[in-house]
Amino acid sequence: MKIFNTLSGKKDEFEPLENNKVRMYVCGMTVYDDTHIGHARTFVSFDIIVRYLRSAGYEVQYIRNITDVDDKILERSKELGMTPFELTDKYIQSMNQDFSTLKTVSYTHLRAHETLL
């Protein structure tokens, strides 16, 4: 499999850093509203890559973040009369349902507020 290298401007043969193991991090959603087609396109695209790598025999660790601390979240929660955590929990559940409907592969998610100092 070849991957486009933006630094060199060339397609390079994919070589994992660790034999037969691939770690993928994909920037996730900022959860202040429903999932839209742009989100779906991103996650379906990476879903295809994860499935391909697994079918090629790689062990894949797939991680996406969820941004649950953001000015847009604070504004939206005030508009709806909810706490920021109530708002983000609502949209995380909705997002997970949408991706379940799309039958995307499971992933590990990191919530931004859990990784802040």
Question: Where do the protein language model's features map onto the residues?
Answer:
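Conserved small/polar residues in nucleotide/adenosyl-binding loops
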Residues: 108-117
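N-terminal catalytic cores of NTP/NDP-binding nucleotidyl/phosphoryl-transfer enzymes
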Residues: 1-75, 80-84, 110-111
